[in-house]
């Protein structure tokens, strides 16, 4: 059983790395792509954000299907399907090609819900936070592509760079054929029954909001920073890619730390600090005329989003152990959608005002609202615990 645990944790975590590497292909190479395909600023924002749509919405059925058929089959099918949009993008010569191919790249982001549904089955509840945190560190795949793809593209061209990812996908599909767990525990409760059990629970929607902000901030900065740093601060694509990779690395490496801390202390207390930090970072980014101050604000977002992501996914199986697949899918879908809207909002704000301050202040205000909600949830839990203890004392 121990070997089975470690094999699945390693294989599924590496699979998430591969999926996220593919997911951010367009945003990582957009500076080189626009040399061949002319795009307006609005079209660039749309093209870089479009993979997030399917990458978010597909997480709900993938979470459910993982519970029903197992991670082995779902990872295999996902990697095989990804071969088609990756090849399409490698021969793209129009805005339509980038939008159509980019939409189906979203499968790479959707695979997240496979592991967070599958892996807790192999471990006791007190380890769910750190296990999901380790798996979530597969986000580092976005850093790998963001840093490496522009460098490789300078040497061989962006189309050849994209084609290299076909090999990566084929390798991981084969790894799941060989080492995927054929005997994973399956849950065959109907999707209708699972949805009925969770959708009226306000905790599900609070967790969805929290992940909308923490993971949404991570995704939004990942897809927006490479082009933003080039356009706004005049950096070259390789330098912008390196800085974005640094942001991703900090956030990703702190995700397991968030899960570990949530296993050891109150997850809601941790989220208080997370949202307080995001509130502060939004204010800093709103008034960042220099690259130094902007870097500090971005790294604050990286720290808070990483710890917050790990903490939220400690809470999902804690509250919804019997409906983990559908609950994981809904919460992670909301997180993905949180990465879709900010780039479009920032682009619209910039076109209307010539600056990004209002867009970053919106991050601060939403984070502040979540901070208040977490405090409310924390005191509700305290009151519930106090009431239960009093009733036990009376009995």
Curated annotation (Swiss-Prot):
One of its GO terms (cellular component) is plasma membrane. The chain crosses the membrane at residues 15-35, 44-64, 73-93, 96-116, 133-153, 160-180, 203-223, 240-262, 271-291, 293-313, 330-350, 357-377. The keyword Transmembrane helix applies. Signal peptide: none annotated. InterPro entries: MFS (IPR011701), MFS_dom (IPR020846), MFS_trans_sf (IPR036259), NO3_transporter (IPR044772). Belongs to the major facilitator superfamily. Nitrate/nitrite porter (TC 2.A.1.8) family. Involved in excretion of nitrite produced by the dissimilatory reduction of nitrate. This is Nitrite extrusion protein.
């Amino acid at each position: 059983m121990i070997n089975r645990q470690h094999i699945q944790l390693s294989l599924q975590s590496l699979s998430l790395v591969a999926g996220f590497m593919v997911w951010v292909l367009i945003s990582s190479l957009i500076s080189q792509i626009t040399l061949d395909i002319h795009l307006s600023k609005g079209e660039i924002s749309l093209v870089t954000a479009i993979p997030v749509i399917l990458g978010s919405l597909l997480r709900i059925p993938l979470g459910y299907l993982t519970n029903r058929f197992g991670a082995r089959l779902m990872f295999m099918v996902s990697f095989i399907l990804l071969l088609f949009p990756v090849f399409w993008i490698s021969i793209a010569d129009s805005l339509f090609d980038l939008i159509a191919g980019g939409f189906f790249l979203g499968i790479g982001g959707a695979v997240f819900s496979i592991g967070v549904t599958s892996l807790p089955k192999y471990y006791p509840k007190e380890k769910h936070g750190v296990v999901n945190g380790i798996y979530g560190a597969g986000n580092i795949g976005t850093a790998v592509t963001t840093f490496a793809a522009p460098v490789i593209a300078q040497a061989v061209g962006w189309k050849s760079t994209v084609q290299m990812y076909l090999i990566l996908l084929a390798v991981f599909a084969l790894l799941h054929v060989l080492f995927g767990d054929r005997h994973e525990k399956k849950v065959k409760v109907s999707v209708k029954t699972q949805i009925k059990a969770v959708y009226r629970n306000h905790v599900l929607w609070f967790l969805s909001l929290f992940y909308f902000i923490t993971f949404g901030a991570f995704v939004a900065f990942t897809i927006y920073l490479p082009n933003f740093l080039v356009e706004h601060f005049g950096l070259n694509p390789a330098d912008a890619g390196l800085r974005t990779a640094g942001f991703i690395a900090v956030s990703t490496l702190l995700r397991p730390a968030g899960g570990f801390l949530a296993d050891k202390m109150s997850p809601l207390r941790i989220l208080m600090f997370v949202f307080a930090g995001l509130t502060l970072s939004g204010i800093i980014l709103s008034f960042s005329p220099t690259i130094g101050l902007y870097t500090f604000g971005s790294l604050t977002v990286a720290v808070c989003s990483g710890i917050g992501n790990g903490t939220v996914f400690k809470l999902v199986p804690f509250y919804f152990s019997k409906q983990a697949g559908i609950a994981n899918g809904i919460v992670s879908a909301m997180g993905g959608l949180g990465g879709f809207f900010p780039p479009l909002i920032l682009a619209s704000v910039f076109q209307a005002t010539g600056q990004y301050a209002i867009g970053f202040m919106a991050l601060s205000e939403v984070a502040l609202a979540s901070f208040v909600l977490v405090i409310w949830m924390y005191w509700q839990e305290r009151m519930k615990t106090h009431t239960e203890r009093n009733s036990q004392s009376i009995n």
